[in-house]
Structure formats: structure tokens, C-alpha cells
A protein has these predicted regions:
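A structural micro-motif recognizing beta-strand termini
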Residues: 1-2, 16
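Short, well-ordered loop/turn sites that connect or cap secondary structure elements
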Residues: 4-6
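Arginine residue identity/basic-tract feature
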Residues: 9, 26-27, 31, 67, ...
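Hydrophobic beta-strand signal
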Residues: 10-14
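Generic hydrophobic alpha-helical segments
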Residues: 15-18, 72
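Short, Lys/Arg- and Gly-enriched loop/turn segments at beta-strand edges
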Residues: 18-31, 35-52
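Intrinsically disordered, low-complexity, charged/polar segments
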Residues: 53-61, 66-107
Length: 107
């Protein structure tokens, strides 16, 4: 049986080197600001502070399909990270390896 991607389906996403670097940078920036005593509340700002465990290329996380690009055979995903943040992965093809999504195995 072939599965068809659709909005709301949960898939697995494998982080690339660039994804991991981007996620780790925003989490590091948040730690550095906090260590310097800068808080968003003290600055009157509303952005999210990104807190979570370090990620690496090849790490696999659950993701929700938020857009299907049928013409390109790819999807936009909200990747659920091990922290308080998510990662928006755009135009990701189905497949194996880094920077791809795949169907989770049946348990």
C-alpha cells in the first residue's frame, strides 16, 4: 500500500548539517543572552527563547505535514524538536538520508 502525503499526517524528518547548525545557533544565542542577564521580558520583546538539547545532522524527529506541493513532490513540515521550539522545513522531498522525510515504521 502506497501512502499519500496530506496535511496533518505525522512523518519522520532527518536533519541536515545546515538544519542542525541553524537550530543549534538559535538555541546558543538564547543561552548567551540569558547568561548576559538579558531577558525578553526586560527588553519588552515577545519572540520565543529557543531552549532544547543539541541536535546533529542525521537526527530524526517527528514532523507534521503542513503543506503538500504535489507538482514538486515535496512537503513543508513543522518538525517537533526535543525542546520548546519547532523547525520549519520547507519543500522537503520524501526519501532516505539527510534533509528528507519518510513514513514512520508501523509499531
Amino acid at each position: 500500500m502506497t501512502q499519500t502525503p496530506s496535511i496533518g499526517r505525522i512523518v519522520h524528518y532527518t536533519l541536515s548539517e545546515q538544519d542542525a547548525a541553524q537550530i543549534n545557533k538559535r538555541r546558543s544565542d538564547a543561552r548567551n543572552l540569558n547568561a548576559a542577564g538579558v531577558t525578553l521580558a526586560s527588553q519588552g520583546l515577545g519572540p520565543q527563547i529557543h531552549i532544547g538539547n543539541k541536535v546533529e545532522a542525521g537526527d530524526v524527529f517527528p514532523a507534521i505535514i503542513v503543506r503538500v506541493w504535489e507538482s514538486a513532490k515535496s512537503c513543508n513540515l513543522q518538525v517537533l524538536l526535543d525542546g520548546n521550539d519547532t523547525f520549519w522545513a520547507c519543500s522537503i522531498p520524501e526519501g532516505d538520508g539527510l534533509h528528507n522525510w519518510s513514513w514512520p515504521p508501523r509499531a
